[in-house]
UniProtKB/Swiss-Prot annotation:
Keywords: Ribonucleoprotein, Ribosomal protein, RNA-binding, rRNA-binding
Family as reported in the entry's similarity comment: Belongs to the bacterial ribosomal protein bS18 family.
General function of this protein: Binds as a heterodimer with protein bS6 to the central domain of the 16S rRNA, where it helps stabilize the platform of the 30S subunit.
Organism expressing this protein natively: Kocuria rhizophila (strain ATCC 9341 / DSM 348 / NBRC 103217 / DC2201)
NCBIfam families: S18 (TIGR00165)
Matches recorded under InterPro entries: Ribosomal_bS18 (IPR001648), Ribosomal_bS18_CS (IPR018275), Ribosomal_bS18_sf (IPR036870)
Oligomer and partners: Part of the 30S ribosomal subunit. Forms a tight heterodimer with protein bS6.
GO cellular component, one term: cytosolic small ribosomal subunit
Gene Ontology terms, MF aspect: small ribosomal subunit rRNA binding; structural constituent of ribosome
Gene that this sequence comes from: rpsR
GO biological process, one term: translation
This protein's name: Small ribosomal subunit protein bS18
Length: 78
């Protein structure tokens, strides 16, 4: 009997390269909201599909935006 073929999942497309983003800025709230869950948590790398370096920059930008009150610390609430 032949082995069954194992399907490999397609690699995720990098959303930053698709949107042609070269620099991650804490003032770009529309971009940063794509990387935050509805609960206000920063989404994981495996969910968003960005590189390690980009994930660090995104996390730092989100934290800076929260500090200056551009983004909430928590989600929308109840």
């Amino acid at each position: 009997m032949a082995k069954a073929e194992i399907r490999k999942p397609k690699p995720k497309q990098n959303p930053l390269k698709a949107a042609d983003v070269t620099e991650i800025d804490y003032k770009d709230v529309a971009l940063l909201r794509k990387f935050i869950s509805d609960r206000g948590k920063i989404r994981a790398r495996r969910v968003t599909g960005v590189s390690v370096q980009e994930q660090r920059k995104i996390a730092q930008a989100i934290k800076n935006a929260r500090e200056v009150a551009l983004l909430p610390y928590s989600g929308a609430g109840r």
